[in-house]
């Protein structure tokens, strides 16, 4: 059976991931007019820029949907976001600022939950608005087929008939008006935005040019912290974790994790915390640029890693970072539920996150400027008395350290012999100043 359909399957049910925007509205209406039977599915991901979710299915019915459903994905989205924090599943960083993979997390939830809803309705053909140059076309493809092995894919933006008729926003707007719908295009921004309650992505258009900075972006989850006219008073916040799970903010517990994440977003957003500018590698290996917001994820991540460094030993922390980066890349590629990802998640949640219990108090200022004020945990292996410089009882003596250093003579001798061995083969050059062979100065190589 052909998985990807290049032309509209007339007379068949097609599920469309319906956002209510111009693109999916025009696509739904066009498919109905051309003889398909469209079903609309809208994911409630807690998008901060969406004002009325209930109105979206109503609009879909007006445009010709056979049926329209609103699927609440918020609980599952937050669960996956917390799992990503527990695992450090983030691989894109620039200058210490992290992209929290909020769009890939949203796609993992949307791609599985919407297709599951379609399957309940006997809909086995799926369409969405992803383009052939982006990451989402592959993410949705993978998650869709994982959820329904019989699924076929129809994307209007891969159909030449659709593109020839409605290939641009102007054409789509004119089409809607001609069909009796007073659909006015929204004010054209200098970039596009995609969001869920974990974070927002701003990209494309003017942001494709690296001389366009964060200053052209209007944040939807925070404040313009770079604008000195914006007053941002410092604020203290305490985050509590129990066995790797965030349970309280400023001493307040929450009835569910969705409410907790909303409050974390409000706190971090007041300061512009978690906003970053990243150049990344798409799945197809081409580089793209995005400006990201994730105030709540950033707040929880900072507190989690503070506890992590005080509780676990160096080798465990090293494995957390290495496996987290690997897992983050799998998540980015749409492989969050693949076996290799599940293996990494289980290991990190079982052996790392389970011990993360305690409280971290932060002072948030502007943007990503913050200080850690206090760290408290019953599981801390940080013991000041072990390394105190003050006179008093010690867990080890000067003689103990002399013995430990003496044992280092073995590998120091081995290393010295290797350095001179490298010099004999020409890999290192002799140095009159240091007494040891050195890597040749690259500046002198051509002289």
UniProtKB/Swiss-Prot annotation:
Compartment list: Cytoplasm
Binding site for L-aspartate: 131, 135-136
GO biological processes: argininosuccinate metabolic process; L-arginine biosynthetic process; urea cycle
Protein name: Argininosuccinate synthase
Residues that coordinate or bind L-citrulline: 99, 135, 139, 192, 201, 203, 280
Primary gene name: argG
Involved pathway(s): Amino-acid biosynthesis; L-arginine biosynthesis; L-arginine from L-ornithine and carbamoyl phosphate: step 2/3
A single MF term (Gene Ontology): argininosuccinate synthase activity
PANTHER family reported in the protein's UniProt record: ARGININOSUCCINATE SYNTHASE
SUPFAM superfamilies: Adenine nucleotide alpha hydrolases-like, Argininosuccinate synthetase, C-terminal domain
Species this chain originates from: Shigella flexneri
InterPro entries: Arg_succ_synth_type2_subfam, Arginosuc_syn_C, Arginosuc_syn_N, Arginosuc_synth, Arginosuc_synth_CS, Arginosuc_synth_type_1_subfam, AS_cat/multimer_dom_body, AS_multimer_C_tail
Residues where ATP binds: 17-25, 43, 129, 131, 136, 194
Reaction catalysis annotation: L-citrulline + L-aspartate + ATP = 2-(N(omega)-L-arginino)succinate + AMP + diphosphate + H(+)
